[in-house]
């Protein structure tokens, strides 16, 4: 029993902006039954769980191909969108929460949400990669707590940017990274990221951090109201609907994998 407890030890949760997580196209899974799955970001974070916050931009109930129900949602932070889904595999408390959340969103009430979630990853037959979240815990928050999360996520992102910077002038080996001052826990992810992503442009992440901190300090208006509805042309409307349908299919595939775990 003790060995089993060690095998399913909960992984730490990362504070992370949507842009870093959403751009990830690399995952890693061990060979053991209880080995965790990681999404590896361009900055070398090996993410199994993460803490996100933002405005609930969309939430809807859909019926999957096998007849079960799934809630698909989007959370917007200053850097972009996180996608999440809550299905029949979720805890009773989470399902009850998302039902209440849907009522608020449908009423037009702007809702700031924070959640701790498992990182999910799916690759289509064509090779496209999509990330999403499976919420573990979530709650509605106010501006002050959102500002606190923005500071925490910005600080964590800057730390990963600094760690990545240390690797630019050293050989892509664990020993060289250690000698360069890279934190031991970041080395495996940074090595994998270098191999998969190659040279990356980090300027967007730095701009995301600056904007997040400006919002936290009250210099910019936080996103607490839904964005205005655009008058789309018929072609644009069809394209947007196709994108949403594809995202729903992907989330349904991820749910099916979760149900099989």
Residue ranges of model-derived segments:
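OB/S1-fold single-stranded nucleic-acid-binding modules
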Residues: 1-46, 261
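Short acidic (Asp/Glu) patches
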Residues: 36, 90-102
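Structural detector for short beta-strands of small beta-barrel domains
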Residues: 47-67
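Core residues of folded domains in eukaryotic genome-function proteins
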Residues: 48-52, 69-71, 111-115, 129
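Residue-level recognition of well-ordered beta-strand positions that form the cores
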Residues: 53-55, 74-76, 116-118
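OB-fold (S1/OB) nucleic-acid-binding surfaces
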Residues: 62-94, 133-144
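Extended, charge-rich, solvent-exposed interface segments
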Residues: 99-114, 118, 124-240, 245-254, ...
């Amino acid at each position: 029993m003790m060995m089993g407890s060690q095998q399913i030890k909960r992984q730490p949760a990362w504070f992370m902006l949507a842009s870093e997580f959403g751009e990830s196209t690399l995952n890693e899974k061990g060979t053991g039954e209880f080995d965790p799955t990681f999404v590896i970001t361009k900055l070398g974070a090996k993410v199994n769980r993460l803490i996100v916050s933002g405005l609930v931009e969309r939430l809807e109930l859909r019926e999957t191909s096998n007849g079960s129900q799934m809630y698909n949602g989007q959370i917007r932070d200053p850097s972009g969108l996180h996608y999440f889904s809550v299905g029949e595999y979720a805890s009773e408390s989470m399902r009850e929460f998302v039902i209440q959340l849907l009522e608020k969103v449908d009423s037009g009430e702007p809702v700031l949400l924070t959640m701790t979630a498992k990182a999910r990853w799916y690759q289509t037959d064509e090779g496209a990669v999509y990330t999403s979240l499976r919420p573990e815990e979530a709650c509605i928050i106010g501006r002050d707590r959102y500002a606190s999360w923005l500071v925490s996520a910005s600080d964590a992102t800057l730390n990963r940017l600094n760690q990545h910077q240390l690797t630019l002038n050293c050989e892509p080996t664990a020993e060289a990274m250690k000698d360069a001052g890279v934190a031991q826990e970041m080395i495996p992810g940074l090595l994998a990221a270098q191999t998969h992503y190659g040279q990356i442009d980090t300027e967007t992440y730095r701009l995301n951090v600056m904007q997040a901190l400006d919002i936290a300090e009250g210099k910019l208006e936080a996103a607490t109201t839904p964005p205005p509805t655009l008058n789309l042309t018929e072609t644009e409307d069809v394209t947007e609907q196709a994108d949403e349908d594809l995202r729903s299919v992907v989330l349904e595939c991820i749910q099916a994998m979760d149900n099989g775990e």
